[in-house]
């Protein structure tokens, strides 16, 4: 401060995380303003890490929604107290009372391995646990959703199979709210931490270990992005 008032900045500590996020291409994050987490969970690392507190039946959704196109993101199960009640997926009706209890809520449960929609639980895929990376591919052009564990598409899924929907978890309805959003939820008093990678190349502050093949829109993921899919970003939404 050259004014003589000594309003000087102090050099701070810490480590900077280099990301692709910029004004020209903003990446999705999780949304702490979501109506149904009720302030119970904590968010860090640019709202990409979600610490699920012990409150029951809560979920949060992402900041960007979609009604068409093909989208891919990853989320790492960092730690848990119980995988039984945690699930990943998408949601349209974000004012619902619990995850996947409506016709427009779709989830993949870790233990036991189940898919969940409209309160119906069906055995599907393999179990996942702490340390696993779950990939989500949503094909809104054909109304299909696919899930992978550590790069392996469950039920021999093929996100590029179009209307055939080979190995898809669900044929999803058109979003009643106009959009679907990425979601993480749980249904009982268990705790857990999830870190999302919407294409910035990090889970929390840890960079992906071996970046896969990206889509046409800039993004860095642990595993290959299925052909024709894009990261959930402002540039991707406007292509």
Language-model region placement:
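PRY/SPRY (B30.2) beta-sandwich protein-interaction domains
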Residues: 1-239
